[in-house]
Amino acid sequence: MTMKLVAAALCLSLLAAGLWVGLSLTAESIEEGKPGGEKPGGGKPGGSGRGCFLPPLPKEDVSLCRNLEVFYMEMGNISCKIVPKCNLYRQKITAWQAPIVKFHTALDGALYLLVMVDPDAPSRSNPVMKYWRHWLVSNITGADMKSGSIRGNVLSDYSPPTPPPETGLHRYQFFVYLQGDRDISLSVEEKADLGGWNLDKFLQQYGLRDPDTSTQFMTQFDEELSSEFGRINDDQEQFNQK
C-alpha cells in the first residue's frame, strides 16, 4: 500500500513539473509575439512597442493584403493588423501625420496613384457614407513608392483615422494604381465632401481597374484619455526625421 502511495505521489510530481514547463514555454512564446500578434516596431520605421502586440486581421479581411507596407511611428508596419488599445495607439493614430507607404516592386519609371479610404463610414453595419476619402495623391514616382516618400499631386490631404464612438472597428484601405499618362483630378462636387465618395465611378472615369497593390488595417474609437497624448506631435517630428 505504501509503495502505491509513493508511486502515485511521484506521478503527480512529474505531472506538475510537466505542466509548469509547458506554461513557461507558452508564456515565453507570447512574450516573443508568437503566436497571435506582433510586437510594434519590429526593427523597422517606428519604435519601442513597449510590450504590446498588433493582432492580425480576421481571415475574412486579409484579401487586400498584397505587398504594400504602411508604417506609423512607434507601431511600425501595421499592414494587415489591428491597432491595439495599449500605449494609447488608438488615440495617437488620430493625431499622427501621414504614414510611410512602401511598394517595394514599384517600377522606377512609372507614375502611381495612392488612395486611402474608409469603407465603414459611419460604421461597418451601416456604411451610408462609404467611401470616406482619407488621402489621395497622384503622380507619385516609382522611386518614391519604393522609398515610402509619398510626394506628388495631392488631391486630398491626409486625414488620419477618426472612427466615431460606438461604431466598432473600421477598415482603412490603401490602394496603389499604375497611373500611366493619365491626368487625374477631382471634380468640384468630389472636392466639396470627403464622405460618400463614389470610388468605383472615379476609377472608371480614368480607366483604372485592379490596383497594383493594396492593404488595410483596422482601428476603432478609444475613449481613454491621458496626459501622455499631448506629446504626440513632438514624437511625430522625430519620426519624420528618420
Curated annotation (Swiss-Prot):
Residues 38-50 have a biased composition (Gly residues). Gene3D superfamilies: PEBP-like. Residues 31-50 are annotated as: Disordered. Residues 1-26 form the signal peptide. Glycans are attached at N77, N139. It is found in: Secreted. It comes from the Eukaryota. One of its GO terms (cellular component) is extracellular region. Residues 210-242 are annotated as: Important for secretion. InterPro entries: PEBP (IPR008914), PEBP-like_sf (IPR036610), PEBP_euk (IPR035810), Phosphatidylethanolamine-bd_CS (IPR001858). The keyword Secreted applies. Keywords: Glycoprotein, Secreted, Signal. The keyword Signal applies. Belongs to the phosphatidylethanolamine-binding protein family. Promotes AKT phosphorylation, suggesting a possible role in the PI3K-AKT signaling pathway. This is Phosphatidylethanolamine-binding protein 4. It comes from Mus musculus (Mouse).
